[in-house]
């Protein structure tokens, strides 16, 4: 079987690329190991909602059209949205077709699947950045009788063993799950590492409205001094609750969650924690306030004072004067450790020498290094700060599909340009933001 381009993955990134390839009359196929939006259907917990408001679900040729633009979609609603998008754009998706190998050929690539082999000149890796839970090696040292659970396995508190829960990690996933489990009646201890605090609503508007309008989400990969760090920053402490409330360490301690420092070691059934909790929360508060300062400056420059509320600042994060540095898990009644320690992609099937020592694809803005015709989509800060979001897939797909068209046309592709000029929309202020 042949196609000019093979797109691996039928999530939002793969579907956005499909639409953009079709607009350029580039024949292609989208290969999906499960169903459209498969990860959203099978690898998320029951109560999870998108962290971005509904109006921000913008894909090429499609967007939100309901009556609740400021709400947050459930996973079922997200899946239905993406399934409908695939239908509207008539994406050539082959479901239940698992890619088992991608190999380089003289004239392109061989893509082996569970349903035969495809030959193509172009391969777009859009299989996602969250294929495997990044559970640290320390998990192997957990004492017997204590369950080890990743967010991909977690569904709801009732499915956990009765007793206390140690949640490791305090970014968006960690704080949401800690909040839910604590409210279920199971006592939670939260091990806090690097995190970025942010209010859900600021000056009467969703924080994503501010970041979108001020151009923060449009910061580009070629404008960032340390792109590797930017791609590995933790997600903002946000949740898509229907009541639009914020979730942060203060809201968690208010309902009884105990805070400890970063989990550093596990010895003889005792968890050992870093003594740097105070520094971590102070740095997180500093980053939040720096973000709010930038937003305020942008609002003032745009004369938005009459449209939004007054500037706000939030109480510093509260922690105990002497947080516990060690915890005997059995004596403390801990029965489950939940590892909210991030995710990583799975490229075990990619048999092309383009991975670095940590298993990441080496790329420049989504154009894979040293393998012409190979492209990447859907990872954090691929081309913009918003690249991993549903809202970020469109701009990236437009630019990379233009690069693909030039490549196929025999031209030497230049660096993909900016499909949407942000400066005339947000001004230079938004492009110089020193964001954490």
Give the location of each predicted region.
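N-terminal glycine-rich dinucleotide-binding loop that anchors FAD/FMN and/or NAD(P) in oxidoreductases
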Residues: 44-67, 208-223
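Flavin (primarily FAD) cofactor-binding/catalytic cores of flavoenzymes
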Residues: 1-42, 72-425, 433-436
